[in-house]
Structure formats: structure tokens, C-alpha cells
Amino acid sequence: MRILVTLFAAALLVGCQSRVADVFDSRQNAGPCPPVGAVYDVARYVAFADGTDETYPNITYTAEIVDVRMFCRYADKDPLVAQMEIDFAFGKGDAARSDTHAYPYFVAVTRRNGKVLGKEYFNVEADFNGRKLDGRTESIARIEIPRLDESIAGSNFEILVGFDLTPEQLEFNRAGKRFLLNAEQ
């Protein structure tokens, strides 16, 4: 009886394997994936308490996009489909009033010439739990880029990420100022 159960289980597993293998597309990518990265001017987030100077004791929250990774798939005339992971590092300053903070960020698909084809906004939540530092990896399961025909390669596009900053935060970053709360470690 044990032999029959073992053979039956093996037959089921082999059957499952073949169905799972059929789901994966074995065709070669039609070309390279689009380059992906964080836009330098908006890769850092620094917020100060309202009405205060831009000094270290007045920092409420900071964040930085640490890494961006992408996997893409396309063949023949299929649209380019990408999955992305974004690593964030967060800091909570002495002027912060809450143990959680939502950081707004965007993901944009552009042509290599800079024309924005699509842009979506997201929030990533930091939960400090009484600590000063936190980190998180956010996953975006599906980014789809339609292609006119199979001659259009992923290298014709870029996928860019950054924080959705206020004009003051953007000016702070462009001035080259940096306050990262993990600098004291």
C-alpha cells in the first residue's frame, strides 16, 4: 500500500511540475530591459518642523532611496512588463511628533529623450517603533509599457523613481545640503 501511495504522490508531483513549467514563458527577451534608477535631486527627503531653521535639531523626518532593482520580460509584439523593488532608509529626528510617517514617492516611465509617458504616485510608511531608524523594501508588481511593434526595445525607455517633494525640499536638495540621521552611527 505504501508503494502505491508513493507512486501516486510522485505522479501528482510530476503532473504539477509540467503545469507549472507551462506557465513560464521560455522565449528570449526581445532586447534589454530599460535602465532604472533614482533621480538624484529627489532621491533624498528631509523635512523640518514648521517655521524652524534648517538645522539638525529641527529635523522631523528623513529618507533616502538606497537601491532600485528591476526585472522585465517581453518578446515578439508583447508589451514590456516589469517588476520593481525599491529599498528605502528612513530617519526620525528630535523634532518628530509621531512614531510613523508616510513618505510620498513616484515611479515614472519615460522615453530616453526625457518625455514622461506615465507617472504614478505611492506612499511608503515608516514605523519607527520608538527607534530613530527604519528601512523597507517596496515592491511594484507590474509596470506595463506598450510597444508599437517588436522593433521597439526596452532600451528606448527609462524607469525613474524619486520622492514627491515640496518646492522647499527640492531646493534644499539642489543646494547640496545633506542631513541624514544615520550619519551619527
Features from the language model and the residues they span:
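C-terminal motif of bacterial Sec signal peptides marking the signal peptidase cleavage site
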Residues: 12-15
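Mid-length scaffold segments of soluble, non-membrane domains
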Residues: 74-119
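Bacterial signal peptide processing site
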Residues: 17-20
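Sec-dependent signal peptide recognition
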Residues: 1-9
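Short, solvent-exposed, Trp/other aromatic-anchored flexible loops in extracytoplasmic proteins
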Residues: 124-157
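Post-signal peptide N-terminal segment of mature Sec-exported envelope proteins
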Residues: 24-51
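Internal, hydrophobic beta-strand segments that form the core of beta-sheet-rich folds
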Residues: 103-110, 155-168
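Low-complexity, acidic Ser/Thr/Pro/Gly-rich terminal tails and inter-domain linkers that flank the onset
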Residues: 54-77
